[in-house]
Amino acid sequence: TFKTRTSMSKNIIIIQHIDIETPGYILDLMQEDNFNLTTIELDEGEKIPSNLEQFDGMFCMGGPMDTWMEKDYPWLIDEKKKIMEFVVDLKKPYLGFCLGCQLLGEVIGGKVVKSKPPEIGILDISMSDNYLNDHIFNRFHSSFKALQWHSYEVQDLENNNNVTLLGSSPTTKYQIFKYKNHAYGIQFHIEIKDNTVSQWGCVPEYEKALEDSLGKGALKKFDLKAQENMKLMNVNAENLYKNFKKIL
């Protein structure tokens, strides 16, 4: 009804590092809910607003750069400060995907290190024993397929009492983690749509990582595998979004 739509109209800030990495499927759901969306394209020189209190939630997306590349991408310095302010000081809801996951991990005291090996493809995620108690991921199956496309990962969060590990893959421990009960790092790509893989394959850094990992011509196979699993991945994205809305 009209009434619930207006009452649900939240202010969301979306931080992007390359224009083709958006909240994707979740973006469509937010638009259907008439959310007020502010997108900041950092790689094009846009700045994160200084008044973060106006936002109910923050999405921080992926990108071809890495967290340590502050010399090449000086805006990373301010971005980390703003994430720290939003998550630690203001204690507001945050979803970080891939690079956005790594930025959260670094901000709360973890290390971002090279993945050995990189994870690229449609791969398995296994949830931790405690995940059913989590108010965002409790609708997920205990294991599921997810799209991975990363060469770095978060480590060394074990000693942070505010961090809960929620999901891992065979080679990456911190696939899903949360800081307290409002900020989530998600290393894989839950937000993908039908055209995501073919679009991302046009980014030189992504194409190189893909071919280094899976060989020449891997994009087509990867895309087909993604299409086979798309329905399930979209259901997971929808469940994540429905639950995330409740904490906004």
Predicted regions and their residues:
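Short, glycine/charged-enriched secondary-structure capping and boundary segments
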Residues: 27-29, 55, 72-75, 108-112, ...
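A short acidic, often aromatic-flanked loop/helix-cap motif at beta-alpha or helix-coil junctions
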Residues: 44-48, 120, 154, 173-174
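Short glycine-/acidic-enriched loop or helix-start segments at secondary-structure transitions
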Residues: 23-25, 49, 69-71, 104-107, ...
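Cysteine-nucleophile active-site neighborhood
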Residues: 60-131
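Amide-donor transfer/coupling interface in amidating biosynthetic enzymes
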Residues: 127-248
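Conserved beta-strand segments of alpha/beta enzyme cores
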Residues: 36-38, 111, 145, 164
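N-terminal beta1-alpha1 cap of cysteine-dependent amidohydrolase-like domains
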Residues: 1-89, 214-248
